């Protein structure tokens, strides 16, 4: 039974109402510093920990709760007579409920003006110590680190005579250990990232020890293949526009491949300002287009490769209305993603309950790192977030691109970034015309992209081509020109750049170098 609670929080969300409810249930309240003042100002009967222990707060608040009368009351096992006799001998009441959250270390180091001294002062000592003590003794002590759990604990106390069951206590304890591990991990990441221990700003983005924490969203039916087990995890702090924040409106449970392909589709479609549609198959765009609205963009994207679009993942960067829904509903689709769906659009898909509809807010989608596991290790890199600006482009041919060609080139370049290497993308009039992906030679990707366009009945005459990396020889360029391309955008950087540029001049096409490569593996 909960008779006494100790409350000490940095995040004071909902704490007054929670403490009042505890007091109404007859629970004695102990508290520290600012929390105690807040509760007292609200008219609640609260005892300061300093008065409770008979030992004042000291060292500018660094020592508040590190006292046997606090930790003895938390750690004593109620089922061991010798523990309870020791408490009685030293006049230590039990503390049955601990409500603590920690100094905002992560928020502090995120500030531009944060100094190392600021960071150090926001490393909580007493809080984690109490939390770990209570979590260790969870059979007898209820511990809350998250304000979201206030209501759950109160409801259980009211229903069970101020008692919280073991299952809830165990869940709350595991939450504490996860929280303190993340907290210590953030401190380690920060301190080991400092290149000059005297300067907060001198930080290596890749700390000597990398700690990362994720929380499980769900177990998956299987992994990439049926014989593989799998689960989906998300970052503890998830950017607003991240796929992991999806809201599923209808459809079957998402699979491992659904999630992976949906992320590729969503990240690609968000890069466009105009209404856009991206169709993904096996993590590669097989159709991308911009249009007047979602329905128009979808119609153009679907034209690129109707065969590959079968069973694909489709993403929009605008609301899906009835017209777009009716167009998509004519095809077999695994997942449809958009910022929102009109009621009429939802009604269209109500007759196709296997189609998974996902709503995700537009916005930044990824945290700082891109990760790839290798045997016994982890490759960590910054995101490929580079978008070339017009002033960074360099025309290297005698003929310059026309304004229309420039628009097509920039569109093609944006798409190529999301195609598996080696990538060749033909585009024109705001849509992909042919996509060559994932080939070991660039010339083969060029040939495949050309064949894809022919199979779809699309002309490549006057088209623009993007290559995610340089042309090592002129052969790839010759293939795209023979197919009908009149302008090319590529990074450059080959030892044979002069030969490739000369070939472009020979064909009288325009060529732009970006100086940026977009390998994608």
UniProtKB/Swiss-Prot annotation:
Keywords: Hydrolase, Multifunctional enzyme, Purine biosynthesis, Transferase. SMART domains: AICARFT_IMPCHas (SM00798), MGS (SM00851). InterPro entries: AICAR_Tfase_dup_dom_sf, Cytidine_deaminase-like, MGS-like_dom, MGS-like_dom_sf, PurH-like. Residues 1-145 form the MGS-like domain. It holds the Pfam family MGS. It comes from the Bacteria. Pathway: Purine metabolism; IMP biosynthesis via de novo pathway; 5-formamido-1-(5-phospho-D-ribosyl)imidazole-4-carboxamide from 5-amino-1-(5-phospho-D-ribosyl)imidazole-4-carboxamide (10-formyl THF route): step 1/1; Purine metabolism; IMP biosynthesis via de novo pathway; IMP from 5-formamido-1-(5-phospho-D-ribosyl)imidazole-4-carboxamide: step 1/1. The keyword ATP-binding does not apply. GO terms for cellular component: cytosol. It catalyses: (6R)-10-formyltetrahydrofolate + 5-amino-1-(5-phospho-beta-D-ribosyl)imidazole-4-carboxamide = 5-formamido-1-(5-phospho-D-ribosyl)imidazole-4-carboxamide + (6S)-5,6,7,8-tetrahydrofolate; IMP + H2O = 5-formamido-1-(5-phospho-D-ribosyl)imidazole-4-carboxamide. One of its GO terms (molecular function) is IMP cyclohydrolase activity. Its EC number is 2.1.2.3, 3.5.4.10. Transmembrane segments: none annotated. The keyword Hydrolase applies. One of its GO terms (biological process) is 'de novo' IMP biosynthetic process. Belongs to the PurH family. The IMP cyclohydrolase activity resides in the N-terminal region. This is Bifunctional purine biosynthesis protein PurH. The gene is purH.
């Amino acid at each position: 039974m909960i008779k006494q609670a100790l409350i000490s929080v940095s995040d004071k969300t909902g704490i007054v109402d929670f403490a009042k409810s505890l007091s109404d249930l007859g629970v004695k309240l102990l508290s520290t510093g600012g929390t105690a003042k807040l509760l007292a100002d609200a008219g609640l009967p609260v005892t300061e920990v300093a008065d409770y222990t008979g030992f004042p707060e000291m060292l500018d608040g660094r020592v508040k709760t590190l006292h046997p009368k606090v930790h003895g009351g938390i750690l004593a096992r109620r089922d061991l007579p010798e523990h309870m006799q020791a408490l009685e001998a030293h006049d230590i009441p039990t503390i049955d409920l601990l409500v603590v959250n920690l100094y905002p270390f992560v928020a502090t180091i995120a500030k531009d003006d944060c100094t190392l001294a600021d960071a150090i002062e926001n490393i909580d000592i007493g809080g984690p110590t109490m939390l770990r003590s209570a979590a260790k003794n969870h059979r007898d002590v209820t511990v809350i680190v998250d304000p979201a759990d206030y209501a759950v604990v109160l409801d259980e106390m009211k229903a069970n005579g101020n008692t919280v069951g073991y299952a809830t206590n165990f869940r709350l304890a595991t939450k504490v250990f996860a929280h303190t591990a993340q907290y210590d991990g953030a401190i380690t990441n920060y301190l080991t990232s400092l290149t000059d221990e005297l300067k907060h700003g001198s930080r290596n983005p890749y700390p000597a020890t990398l700690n990362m924490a994720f929380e499980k969203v769900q177990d998956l039916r299987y992994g990439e293949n049926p014989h593989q087990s799998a689960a989906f995890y998300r970052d503890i702090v998830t950017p607003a526009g991240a796929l992991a924040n999806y809201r599923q409106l209808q459809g079957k449970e998402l699979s491992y491949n659904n999630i992976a392909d949906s992320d590729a589709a969503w990240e690609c479609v968000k890069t466009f300002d105009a209404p856009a549609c991206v169709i993904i198959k096996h993590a590669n765009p097989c159709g991308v287009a911009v249009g007047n609205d979602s329905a128009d963009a979808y119609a153009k994207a679907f034209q690129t490769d109707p065969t590959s679009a079968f069973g694909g993942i489709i993403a929009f960067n605008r609301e899906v209305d009835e017209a777009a829904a009716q167009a998509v509903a004519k095809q077999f689709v695994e997942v449809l993603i958009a910022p929102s769906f009109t009621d009429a659009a939802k009604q269209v898909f109500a007759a196709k309950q296997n189609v998974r509809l996902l709503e995700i807010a537009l916005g930044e989608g990824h945290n700082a790192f891109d990760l790839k596991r290798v045997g016994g290790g982890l490759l960590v890199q910054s995101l490929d977030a580079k978008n070339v600006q017009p002033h960074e482009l360099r025309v290297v041919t005698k003929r310059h691109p026309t304004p229309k060609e420039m628009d097509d080139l920039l569109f093609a370049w944006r798409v190529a970034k999301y195609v598996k290497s080696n990538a060749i993308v033909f585009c024109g009039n705001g849509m992909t015309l042919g996509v060559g992906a994932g080939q070991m030679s660039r010339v083969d990707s060029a040939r495949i992209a050309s064949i894809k366009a022919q199979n779809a009945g699309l002309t490549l005459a006057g088209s623009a081509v993007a290559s995610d990396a340089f042309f090592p020889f002129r052969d790839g360029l010759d293939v795209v020109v023979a197919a009908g391309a009149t302008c090319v955008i590529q990074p450059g950087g080959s030892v044979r750049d002069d030969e490739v540029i000369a070939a472009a001049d020979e064909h009288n096409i325009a060529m732009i170098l970006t100086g940026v490569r977009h390998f994608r593996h």
